[in-house]
């Protein structure tokens, strides 16, 4: 009876908007989504402990008074990872925050549920990139969607690392639908962009949000951007709840294969004060993005999430330098000139010519 009522209400809404009807999620959608992201947290933590060799995650469980809770796992002072965290959360409530209602006003007035896993790793060695991922699921009455992504933030440029990370996630996306990576790659470049610096946070990866069973893939905020253009050219790409569930699972499981080979290749590279200082300086961009632009941070703070877990993404050490300019022709200059602007990492052969003089190929 309840599901029939939802269908009638939803049908009226969709008919008014002249858009396809939203598929209802499975009756066990919340349990399955919760199990999926908890499983990803377990798999990733086990893989990272093996990769580090010495560091171990310390777990802290927490309860949200308004409903829900989670478990935060943090590694400090490992052999490879200076600090890293892998979170799981499941939260629910009756009043949605403004950041959600602005995007999906039809969710207003419905009790809501959200679950997800998020991770940020800050390696010690400047030649190993910082990495981030987040996969999540949201429901509010008849409204539901999946979101997620992963992105790589190098401090020293290596074309092979960027290509490997992108290729691995492209394969994961293609296992669900061939259109996905074509939109989610430029969407990632768009999302992880520091407008006040006019640069991307790193070399990107994939990003997607508000994915339900309707319409075109791009549901972002720049209707004239590259992701919107590709999405419009591809047209409607209807995906079922099951396909979108598989998308999060496939990309979550692609994380270790996308990142572990980079760590194994770079962790023994020697470095000095110059490289460490540049790493700490570039970490400042990470802090700026997360505190100024990141919607996940904003959502967590607006919904009385656990502050320690929300800000777990910040690096343990960071520095700012007024008016810094990289030395012309240096690897630091290549990083800031090439690796902080959107590139066709998998399809542009000219990148090799730009990287080769700086030993940034292998």
UniProtKB/Swiss-Prot annotation:
Pathway connected to this protein: Porphyrin-containing compound metabolism; protoporphyrin-IX biosynthesis; protoporphyrinogen-IX from coproporphyrinogen-III (O2 route): step 1/1
One GO CC term on file: cytoplasm
GO function terms (MF aspect): coproporphyrinogen oxidase activity; metal ion binding; protein homodimerization activity
Residues at the active site: 132 (proton donor)
Main subcellular location: cytoplasm
Important for dimerization: annotated segments: 286-321
SUPFAM superfamilies to which the protein is assigned, alphabetical: Coproporphyrinogen III oxidase (SSF102886)
GO BP term, pick one: chlorophyll biosynthetic process
Region (Disordered): 12-31
Gene3D superfamilies on file: Coproporphyrinogen III oxidase, aerobic
Cofactor(s) needed for function: a divalent metal cation
EC assignment: 1.3.3.3
Location in or out of the cell: Cytoplasm
Family membership noted in the UniProt record: Belongs to the aerobic coproporphyrinogen-III oxidase family.
Subunit structure: Homodimer.
Protein name, UniProt field: Oxygen-dependent coproporphyrinogen-III oxidase
Organism (species): Synechococcus sp. (strain CC9902)
Lineage: Bacteria, Bacillati, Cyanobacteriota, Cyanophyceae, Synechococcales
Gene name of the record: hemF
């Amino acid at each position: 009876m309840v599901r029939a009522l939802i269908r009638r209400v939803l049908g009226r809404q969709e008919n008014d908007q002249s858009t396809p009807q939203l598929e209802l999620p499975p009756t066990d959608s919340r349990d399955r989504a919760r199990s999926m992201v908890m499983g990803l947290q377990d798999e990733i933590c086990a893989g990272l402990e093996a990769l580090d060799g010495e560091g171990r995650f310390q777990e802290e469980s927490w309860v949200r008074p308004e409903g829900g809770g989670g478990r935060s796992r943090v590694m400090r002072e490992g052999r490879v990872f200076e600090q890293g965290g892998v979170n799981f959360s499941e939260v629910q409530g009756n009043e949605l925050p403004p950041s959600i209602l602005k995007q999906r006003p039809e969710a207003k007035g419905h009790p809501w549920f959200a679950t997800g896993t998020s991770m940020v790793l800050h390696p010690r060695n400047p030649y190993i990139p910082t990495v981030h991922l987040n996969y999540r699921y949201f429901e509010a009455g008849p409204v539901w969607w999946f979101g997620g992504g992963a992105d790589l933030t190098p401090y020293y440029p290596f074309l092979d690392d960027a290509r490997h990370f992108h290729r691995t996630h492209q394969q994961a996306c293609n296992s669900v639908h061939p259109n996905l990576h074509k939109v989610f790659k430029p969407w990632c470049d768009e999302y992880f962009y520091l407008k006040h610096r006019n640069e991307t946070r790193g070399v990107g990866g994939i990003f997607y949000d508000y994915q339900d069973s309707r319409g075109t893939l791009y549901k972002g905020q720049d209707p004239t951007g590259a992701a919107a253009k590709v999405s419009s050219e591809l047209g409607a790409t209807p995906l079922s709840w099951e396909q979108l569930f598989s998308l999060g699972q496939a990309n979550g499981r692609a994380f270790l294969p996308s990142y572990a080979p980079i760590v194994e290749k770079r962790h023994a590279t020697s470095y000095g004060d110059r490289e460490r200082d540049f790493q700490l300086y570039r970490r400042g961009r990470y802090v700026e993005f997360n505190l100024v632009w990141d919607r996940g941070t904003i959502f967590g703070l607006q919904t009385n999430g656990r502050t320690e877990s929300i800000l777990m993404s910040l690096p343990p050490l960071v520095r700012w330098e007024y008016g810094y300019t990289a030395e012309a022709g240096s690897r630091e200059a290549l990083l800031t000139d090439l690796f902080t602007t959107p590139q066709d990492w998998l399809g542009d052969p000219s990148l090799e010519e730009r990287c080769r003089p700086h030993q940034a190929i292998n």
